[in-house]
Structure formats: structure tokens, C-alpha cells
């Protein structure tokens, strides 16, 4: 890595701009950095939570997101009620927020109504922003934002994480045949559980990790497209919000053990 990358690229790329209070508030609400959550440290414009959101979020978007709460799904009528905004205008704003990666959406409720969710940074908005070529080209700092938010929340805490991760970070689902003979493997740890649950709705999407690293010269020779598989409502999300997703079909290549191939 070049010296200027080490010293400059993980800082606010636009220090000359005035500090935006709604973005600071939103960054503080979404972050999972313990020191900031506990009030031991103050979030500033030099922190990635601020400059990452500032790149993809207007003040108006931030005000709406602040009313959503983190990982608290809300339908459009519910958001109209708590924001007082016109329904059509609000829906257009939410669509823009989803396009930028600030929020996601799904239909996982008894009435199967579309609901909007303000996610964490990782996994969440920092990844989504890196999946969209248009966003990443306009705001290459999003690559560094993803790296920072996948690393700094756990600094000083990783030694306390027990084997298995305790639900922290991302969970790897191994190849099915590697766990079929394991008596301790529960259904959630088998890829067949997830593929059967969301049968018929899959999408291939780019690897946000690979795409983000290329923005600060740590990329590899891999083509980042098509590495990740989104299932269920997330498949619709990565396609509809132009996260370079495309619907695919998954075929059983053998009846037992179950191996899967994407096409």
C-alpha cells in the first residue's frame, strides 16, 4: 500500500465541508462502537461513521432514518405516520435511500407488507453501498468506509469473543457434504435449509469486499461479479436497487448429499 494511502485515505475526504448535525446523530445511532455508544468518545466528522454516511445520505434522509431506529422494520404507512411526510414523496425518498444502500427492505411479516429497515453498517449499509457501481464510482471513499466499519468496532474486543463467534460478524455456512455426517450440525448450519426455505428466489450479486478493496489499491485479480448469492427478499433487493444483482436458478447436481450449482 502506498504511503499516502496509509495516512490519508482513511480520513474524511471532504474536511472543507461544514459538519452536518443530522449525519452525526445518525452515525452515533447506527454505530456499534462501544466507546461511542457508552459516551466515552464523541463522534466527529473525522470518523468513518460520519463521512461514510455523508457521502450517500442527505440531511432529509438522515432525519427519516433517525425515526426508523436500527433494525426495527417499519411499513410505509407507519413511516408516514411518524414522519408526517406525504406518502408518495416519502416512498420516493425511501427508494433513493435503498438505491444508495442506506436502508434495505423485505416482506417478512404476517401480512407480507413491504417494510423498510435501517441496518447496521456491517453487515449492512457499508456493504450495500459498495455493491452499486454508480455509488462506488461517485464516492470511492465507500470502499474505505466498509473496511473501517468491519474492523474498528471489534478493536480491543476480539480476545473476548468465544469460539463460534457468539453471533458477532458474519457466519460461514460450509459445503453441505462437510456437515451431513456431523451429529452436532443443526438445520440452520446447512445450506439446504436456506435454499429450501427460499426456493425459487435467488440472485447472484457482486462481492462487496473485493469491490471495496479495489478503491484503495488492495484489490486482487478476481472478477468481483457474481460471488455472493442473495436469497428470498434480499434477492429482490439486490436486483431492484441496482446492486448489480441478477436472478439465477440453483440446480441440485446430485440427490444426496446435496450439492448446489448456480447457473
Report residues per predicted region.
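Short acidic, hydrophobic short linear motifs in intrinsically disordered regions
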Residues: 71-82
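Single conserved hydrophobic/aromatic residue that forms the stacking wall/gate
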Residues: 252-263
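Short helix-coil-helix linker/hinge
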Residues: 55-62
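Long, low-complexity, charged/polar intrinsically disordered regions in eukaryotic proteins
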Residues: 2-46
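Long, Pro/Ser/Thr-rich low-complexity/intrinsically disordered regulatory tracts in eukaryotic proteins
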Residues: 140, 146-238
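Short, amphipathic alpha-helical interaction segments positioned at domain boundaries
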Residues: 115, 120-149
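A short, conserved structural fragment
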Residues: 98-108
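Short amphipathic alpha-helical interaction segments
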Residues: 85-96
